[in-house]
Amino acid sequence: MKATDLFHVTALVAGALALEHQQPLIGDLSQDLNHIIDSSPLLSFHRALVQIPSISEHEKNVGEYVLDFLSSQNLTVEKQIVTPESDTEEERFNIYAYVGKNRQPDVLVTSHIDTVPPFIPYSLHAPTSGTSFIRTDLVIAGRGTVDAKASVAAIVFAALETLDENPNASIGLLFDVGEENSGVGMKHFSNSELNPTPPTYHTVIFGEPTELSLVAAHKGTLGFKLVAEGKAAHSGYPWLGESAISSLIPVLAHLDTLQDLPPEKGGLLRSETLGKSTLNIGRVHGGIAANVVPAHAEAAISVRLAAGTPEDTRTIIERAVAKVTSGDRSVYPDFGDRKAGAPPQYFDVDVDGFEVITVNYGTDAPALKIHDQRTQRVKRYLYGPGSILVAHADNEAITVGELEEAVRGYKRLIAASL
């Protein structure tokens, strides 16, 4: 659901009334909206997750809550330490849960428990003021309500309902830390004994905001810095120095055009599935004062890859920089670890009953290395409630109906995978 659709009550009500099981209208807007949440274990669990701040690198409290909750549901739960507690850092850990002694399940369902800053408190809102509304249209707002605590909550209850119906279902749950800024949690899991070679699981279901659609593909990622070195001087005598900022600007201007240039003319790569690769100049800084010729400047740049590998895009960037600078090495791209970045990711969409889309954002999927697929290909699905368009915004929100439908969606994916 698009963010703007959250408040289009007329359309939502019309769609809801077409459902087999119609719901009564809630007409008394003065009633305690918390009662709707209190009466649902799913919604109560989601509320508890959102009420606990878990900005990346500070996930411990919400992790403990999830661990305790899963333990209370008679699952075997492991705390996989990612970063030990120290005087300067709090403990960071993934949560890995499974049934009984089945430590290597057939189906792995995963999402992340960290959020982007800042923390925004949990709140409930009727879709409009002064009109009746259907329960499923109740809006739940706050940081993480969508990304990705909606997926975490829906995954947990989909798994519990599946196990209630089929106690022998071979399901594992992984909730990791650090997805929003480093991928450290999934990388740690990927390199651990829980991800053997060859893999014991045959399906992985990733939980992210997909508007309840299956994702066929998402773009890859590459981050780098563009650095310019100059020579400081008094601004009254600029010819005695070399302005790093002035050197940086024309190169940035050219890089900014690469997403629109065709590849045969030096532009970024494209694909029929994902369209154009895009480039964002996210941060620029340099110099020390207005009356000093700047000796250093740099820009932080992010590329979303629609095709090819990170190394392909590095080559395109290097050639583009050299074209503007004529080989002057005082302006150069700094890629850091040349093993960093990820190519576009492709997912399975062979389960009926879902719309299929592509998305431009990245996920934990490339961080989970499936080490050997020679004997059996591991299927990967990407699905979840909520819209990415509000996921990192100050209006992050989801409806009750989306959360509840996500449980049904995850159950269908799990059932198709068992």
Curated annotation (Swiss-Prot):
GO terms for cellular component: extracellular region. Its main location: secreted. Zn(2+) 2 binds at residue 147. One of its GO terms (molecular function) is metal ion binding. Zn(2+) 1 binds at residues 147, 180. SUPFAM superfamilies: Bacterial exopeptidase dimerisation domain (SSF55031), Zn-dependent exopeptidases (SSF53187). Its EC number is 3.4.17.-. One of its GO terms (biological process) is proteolysis. Residues 1-18 form the signal peptide. Glycans are attached at residues 74, 168. It holds the Pfam family M20_dimer. Its cofactor is Zn(2+). Belongs to the peptidase M20A family. This is Probable carboxypeptidase AO090166000075. It comes from Aspergillus oryzae (strain ATCC 42149 / RIB 40).
